Amino acid sequence: MSINTGAGTRIYIAPRLTADLPADHAAAITLLSGLTYVEIGEVESIGDYGDTINDVTFAGLAQGRAKHLKGLADAGTSELVVAFDAGDAGQIKLVEAFLDRSRFDYPFKVEYVDGEVDYFAAKVMSNKKSGITVEGVLKRNVTLGINSEIYEVVTP
């Protein structure tokens, strides 16, 4: 595997899940990789994403020292910035996902230029327009609230 820039990276959205992802890692990847995705067009940037483990501390009286334990894993939120295109099928799906109040998540696939893929399940938490200036490109800023681990599929 070599290093790359982000150029050529693509992100896709699939229809809403109808159940929770399987707890088994391999089964979740099998399910996610078998879905039909729509590419989100005109993507300028994909914000940071990935798990952070919460710090749980315990202050033992006898030891006089804090102990750190691992708590909840949180993949956080990721901000997508796209050039606004009301006719783009992927952006239409993002808006539909934003308006959807279901408890189930939407699968996303991030495909890198070297063929590696990340999958995750998220809710679309915001849908804002920006770049409204004389020489600005009208953009859509979308926040994804990630509710699963990041399933990395590495090419051999």
Regions found by a protein language model. Give the residues of each.
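Viral virion structural and adsorption modules
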Residues: M1-T5, T143-G145, E149-P156
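Solvent-exposed edge beta-strands and adjacent loop segments
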Residues: S2-V81, M125-V137
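Short acidic, gly/pro-rich beta-turn/loop elements at beta-sheet edges
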Residues: L21, G90-I92, D118, I132-V134, ...
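A generic structural signal for short beta-strands and their flanking turns/coil linkers
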Residues: D74-S78, S102-Y106, R140
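Charged, amphipathic alpha-helical segments
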Residues: T77-A97
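Residues within well-ordered beta-strands of beta-sheet-rich folds
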Residues: E79-V81, P107-K109, T143-G145
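Short, acidic/charged, Gly/Pro-enriched secondary-structure junctions
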Residues: G90-A121, M125
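Short beta-strand and beta-hairpin "edge-sheet" elements
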Residues: E111-I150
